[in-house]
């Protein structure tokens, strides 16, 4: 693994042409045809690497990878990167399409109205996907992972905040709690659920649920809606106890070599038509308010894509917790060792 990371770092620290844009993104995150359109409009070449968790992305950057122009971390990782002075300023005047964003998503990233450090790009809600042809679900709850009849046929995300967050929501706690007792209770709950899991994993849950290798998986709504588009036997729900919400941001790292093209790409993604087209590809919702009106009604009215207010009221956006967040690392270590 380390050898792979060092090789990746070697590759991404090499020099590159001025008309090349390097992205570090989630898999299946931007419609390929949109990237081709950008390349044609700006006479450039886009190169991208994919990551599967915020933790792996952050670890690679901390090991010294310095070849990226735009990165797409989730909120709590963005906050960590900002605190560690890893991000460059994004100039507001270079983003005329910023007006398309819902203003409620901007206060956390705004600085004096002149520049920002991040642009809200996508919103994901974690929940549960299951095979309708293999099992019945009578209660749309995180408690499904306690079902012994599905032992060995379920997975949960290999992600500290998502897995522990699911247990915290099930117990009625905040996914951002710093109460040691509550976090330990969540770890105990997760250890109980672990007895029924095939494993914790974040890379193969889409394929696993599509092939029926797994009958129930914890996953992100967009990923699971992509599977449902191709497989009518798969369904997805956001549990009644609430979801763990991640807001992904476009950021420009301090070392970016092509900031002009990086700004152009972010502004391109903020175009209402582009954002709507990408939403239809990824099935992840967007803070782009102007794009919502361009979506088909089937997407506008899909509760898995745009959850009802009663679910949102019970859900939590994952926050960076600073050093106190080590309580989660300790709890996760206990779960993994159990």
Question: In which residue ranges do the predicted regions lie?
Answer:
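Early extracytoplasmic/lumenal segment of secretory-pathway proteins
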Residues: 14-81
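A ligand-binding cleft/hinge motif common to bilobed small-molecule-binding domains
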Residues: 77-80, 210, 215-233
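A bilobed periplasmic-binding-protein/Venus flytrap-type ligand-binding module shared by bacterial periplasmic
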Residues: 127-134, 169-170, 246-261, 266, ...
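Periplasmic-binding protein-like
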Residues: 124, 183-192, 230-254
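Ligand-binding "clamshell"
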Residues: 82-90, 112-116, 226-238, 300-302
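Extracytoplasmic ligand-binding site segments that recognize negatively charged/polar headgroups
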Residues: 67, 72-78, 82-196, 201-210
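Mature extracytoplasmic/periplasmic domains
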Residues: 253-312
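Extracellular/periplasmic bilobal clamshell ligand-binding domains
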Residues: 295-338
């Amino acid at each position: 693994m380390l050898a792979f990371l060092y090789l990746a770092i070697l590759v991404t620290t090499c020099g590159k042409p001025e008309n090349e844009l390097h992205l570090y993104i989630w898999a299946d995150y931007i419609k390929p045809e949109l990237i081709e359109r950008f390349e044609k409009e700006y006479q450039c070449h886009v190169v991208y690497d994919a990551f599967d968790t915020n933790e792996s992305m952050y670890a690679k950057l901390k090991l010294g990878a310095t070849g990226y122009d735009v990165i797409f971390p989730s909120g709590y990782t963005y906050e960590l990167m900002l605190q560690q002075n890893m991000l460059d300023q994004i100039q507001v005047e270079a983003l005329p399409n910023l007006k398309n964003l819902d203003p409620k998503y901007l206060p956390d990233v705004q600085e004096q109205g002149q520049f920002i450090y991040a642009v809200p790009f996508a919103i994901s809600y974690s929940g549960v996907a299951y095979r309708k042809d293999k099992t019945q679900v009578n209660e749309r709850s995180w408690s499904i992972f306690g079902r012994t009849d599905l032992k060995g046929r379920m997975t949960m995300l290999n992600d500290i905040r998502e897995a522990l967050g699911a247990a915290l929501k099930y117990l009625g706690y905040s996914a951002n709690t710093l109460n040691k007792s509550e976090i330990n209770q969540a770890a105990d709950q997760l250890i109980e659920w672990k007895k029924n899991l095939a494993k914790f994993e974040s890379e193969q849950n889409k394929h696993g649920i599509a092939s029926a290798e797994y009958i129930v998986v914890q996953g992100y709504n967009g990923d699971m809606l992509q599977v449902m588009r191709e497989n009518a036997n798969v369904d997805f729900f956001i549990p009644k106890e609430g979801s763990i919400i991640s807001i992904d941001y476009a950021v420009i790292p301090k070392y970016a070599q092509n900031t002009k093209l990086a700004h152009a790409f972010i502004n391109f993604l903020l175009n209402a038509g582009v954002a709507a087209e990408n939403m239809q590809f990824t099935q992840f919702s967007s803070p782009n308010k102007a794009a919502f009106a361009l979506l088909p009604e089937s997407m506008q009215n899909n509760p898995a894509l745009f959850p009802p207010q009663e679910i949102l009221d019970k859900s939590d956006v994952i926050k960076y917790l600073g050093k106190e967040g080590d309580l989660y690392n300790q709890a996760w270590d206990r779960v993994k060792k159990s």
